[in-house]
Amino acid sequence: LMGGYEIIDLASLLIDKRLVKRLGGSNWKTDRIEAANIWAKEHGRAPFEISEIQWSLAHCTPRTWGDDTLVCMTEEERMWYEKQNMPVMCFAPQAKGLFSKLLAGKEETLSTTAKRRFLTTENLALAPKVQALCQRLQVSPAAVAMAYLTSQKNPTIAIAGSSRIEQITETLGGADLTLTEEDLLFLQS
């Protein structure tokens, strides 16, 4: 595993040549980002300014993904991003439609991959909370899942993919939805 300082040093060449303006990392834990950024500051180099990791309302782990190189958001990591106000690009923000399918009574339509990654006791216990927010706010589960990310204190970008127009419509249907601090705490409790 190449050290963060080595990557910062090499990436600085791209900035010096004006090939890129800013640096970001994918699947880096916050302690590695922090160490690289400290080194960058001490050596007059550009720091990492954005991170891309797996983050969704649905809890998952590298083990459930079957990929120990993957970084999934944890509460400790989330607090670091919030404190640093560092933007996070969140991949798989809809957890393969987990809450939309669960709340529609279509658990059987979840793919084998979705079941392995996201169909956990913890996420099943979260489904009634998602449903309660959907009913109170009159929005879809997809809207709640996206708003959970975009309502965080640090900037977030949810990288949502879809295979059908209906999925895009459902995801974007709550694009302007902002959850309150109380809503976020309700989902996290």
Protein language model regions, located:
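Beta/alpha (TIM)-barrel catalytic core signal, keyed to glycine-rich beta->alpha loops juxtaposed to Asp/Glu
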Residues: 1-188
